[in-house]
A protein has these predicted regions:
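Short hydrophobic/aromatic beta-strand micro-patches
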Residues: 221, 345-347, 407-409
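N-terminal "arm"/small-domain region of PLP-dependent enzymes with the aminotransferase-like
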Residues: 1-59, 67
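PLP-dependent enzyme catalytic core of the Aspartate aminotransferase-like
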Residues: 99, 117-118, 126-127, 141, ...
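Glycine-centered tight turns that cap/initiate beta-strands
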Residues: 74, 146, 314-317, 364, ...
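Short loop segments at secondary-structure junctions
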Residues: 32, 223-226, 348-351
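Conserved PLP-enzyme active-site core in the AAT-like
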Residues: 7-16, 78-311
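Conserved N-terminal alpha-helix of the aminotransferase class I/II PLP-enzyme fold
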Residues: 37-89, 111-119
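Conserved small-domain helix->loop->beta segment predominantly found in fold-type I
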Residues: 272-275, 279-281, 286, 290, ...
Length: 427
């Protein structure tokens, strides 16, 4: 755990230049690395030494940024991937396979829901989706002998459900499995799930971490707190020899703090790819350096937008946990005391047709599939990101047909509100 505040770590964690070295770490744009002898390289292939030999597994630039994100979350180890989808897939597939079972909150990003309910189902991994507001008894009833993890989002995209992390962590640990949390919308600036019992955190770094809609990427951070050895029979991939590395046992060789990420890197990344380019990681780091400043502005602007919409006669409903009357306000005060995120959701009176007319009338805000970057953008999830869901699945995910997802940027709040006002006048 770093001794610095998070705003300092956003600038300095992961890289401290030596005498005469560049203040900004270099982009190591190379596929391979030279060694003097085959013996030296052989030790890398046997995991007996640390170093780099092929960028499909690891690269110095990537690892520098991963170390920064690890520090921001307060974890023990981290890795970067080519997208948030890849991060969520690796996070699950690293400990679960054909014949295994995962519990997930229903209130998650549509792409993640499809990954779980369609793609990973075809791979033999079964998912049970639970209402995030279910009782402890209902949550515990969802577990099976072959359950390997529980998954949720700190702030759900796009429903903005604030998950009760402690409730889900308690249930997961009672059944000997880790809690995996996607912390994309909150970022470690506003919430550190490890402090509430979460074991593994994922991110779509494409969103606030990058912050400028420049690079697609993902991250996985391990807390190092989950005792894989205590439940060795559940997690043989970590606690028994890996034949592809001459019988190395990850928990023995790398300890509880390094086993999970090491396996995901040297086994899954080796076989499946998904490594981001060093250049993309360099660009991601530029975004990370200003993350606290941007999150503060995003939250301030979103609060102003939510308050404006709440009083507008053409708005049917508004949801933003920063509003005192919001159903997640008290929970947000507990888990996200410094602010939630820059996304506000609402419904325009007149339903879907009115929402689409409103969106078409916006001049400053862009209609885009993206969310959580510096420029304001807007989306209708039911016809885009959650289009693959049926009506029942949409309802379970908290996505109504009239829901508008408004990603508030860091422009002047007066200009954002003026754009909303002129668009609503024509509805």
């Amino acid at each position: 755990m770093s001794d610095y505040q998070i705003s300092t770590d956003c600038l300095h964690a992961g890289y401290r230049p030596g005498n005469g070295e560049p203040r900004n770490f270099p982009i190591v744009q190379s596929t391979t690395f030279r060694y003097e002898t085959s013996e030296e390289m052989g030790k890398l292939f046997d995991l007996e030494a640390s170093g780099y030999f092929y960028t499909r597994l690891q690269n110095p630039t990537n690892d520098t940024v991963a170390a920064k994100i690890c520090a921001l979350e307060g974890g023990s180890a981290a890795m970067l991937l080519s997208s948030g989808q890849a991060a969520n897939f690796y996070a699950i597939f690293n400990i679960a396979g054909c014949g295994d079972h995962i519990i997930s909150s229903t209130s998650i990003y549509g792409g993640t829901f499809n990954l779980f309910s369609v793609t990973m189902k075809r791979m033999g991994v079964e998912f049970t989706f639970v209402d995030p507001e279910c009782s402890e008894e209902e949550l515990n009833a969802a577990f099976r002998p072959n359950t390997k993890a529980v998954f949720g989002e700190t702030i759900a995209n796009p429903a903005l459900t604030v998950l009760d992390i402690e409730k889900f962590a308690k249930a997961a640990h009672a059944h000997g499995v880790p809690l995996i949390m996607d912390n994309t919308f909150a970022t470690p600036v506003n919430c550190r799930p490890f402090q509430w019992g979460c074991d593994i955190v994922t991110h779509s770094t494409t969103k606030y971490m990058d912050g400028h809609a420049l690079t697609v990427g993902g991250a996985i951070v391990d807390s190092g707190n989950f005792d894989w050895n205590a439940y060795a029979d559940k997690f043989p991939g970590l606690t028994t020899p890996d034949e592809s590395y001459h019988g190395v046992t990850y928990t023995q060789r790398f300890g509880l703090e390094g086993a999970y990420i090491t396996k995901a890197t040297v086994q899954l990344m080796r076989d499946l790819g998904s490594i981001p380019s060093p250049n993309n990681c360099f660009l991601l780091n530029i975004g990370l350096e200003t993350l606290p400043l941007r999150m503060k502005k995003h939250c301030e602007n979103a609060q102003a937008v939510a308050e404006y919409l709440q009083g507008h006669d053409k708005i049917a409903w508004v949801q933003y946990a920063g509003l005192p009357g919001d159903k997640y306000h008290q929970r947000a005060q507990k888990y996200l005391p410094n602010g939630t995120c820059g996304v506000v959701i609402f419904g325009v009176k007149g339903g879907r047709a009115a929402a689409e007319k409103f969106m078409a009338g916006l001049k400053l805000a862009s209609i885009a599939t993206h969310v959580a970057d510096a420029k304001t953008c807007v989306l209708h999830p039911a016809s885009s990101t959650h289009r693959q869901m049926n009506d029942a699945e949409l309802a379970a995910a908290g996505v109504s047909p009239d829901l508008v997802r408004f990603s508030v940027g860091i422009e002047d709040a007066k200009d954002i509100i003026a754009d909303l006002e002129q668009a609503l006048e024509n509805v």
